[in-house]
Amino acid sequence: MRHFLSVLPLVLLAGCSSFRPDAEHITPVPGDRVLAYQEDQQNGGRLVVNRDMGLMGGGCYVAIEVDRKLAARIGMAEVVSFNVPAGTRVLGLTIDPLDDTLCGMGRLHKEVAVKVAPGSTQYFHIVSENRGGFDIRPDDKPPQP
């Protein structure tokens, strides 16, 4: 029994980290929460972002920015794509500035520089971890429908 009680906190903490949903459980971000970068870009590329599932921040949207401009508000197990000009883009993750509940009062600011080549598609995913909080990372194995 003592061994069980010593392991229980570790199991509970591990349950808070996010996990990748199966492809059939991922849905597109609804159009009313996709705010920018939907027009085709001549000689541009595409950035595709999906968000993992998990308890931490699970009831909140987070904001995705492209070149520090609000581009979408994404929930758990959702995916969104952006058509962006070629060149170096700044892909960011912040609190949702349109949310006036407790979800919008935290602190979150993660950015990654992305070199976009004409015609390219790059994949990223949003994770939430016990120690590091939210992060946006390149995704070399995106879920395939």
Question: Predicted regions: what is each one?
Answer:
Residues 16-145:
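Short loop/turn and low-complexity linker motifs enriched in small/turn-promoting residues
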Residues 1-18:
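Sec-dependent bacterial lipoprotein signal peptides
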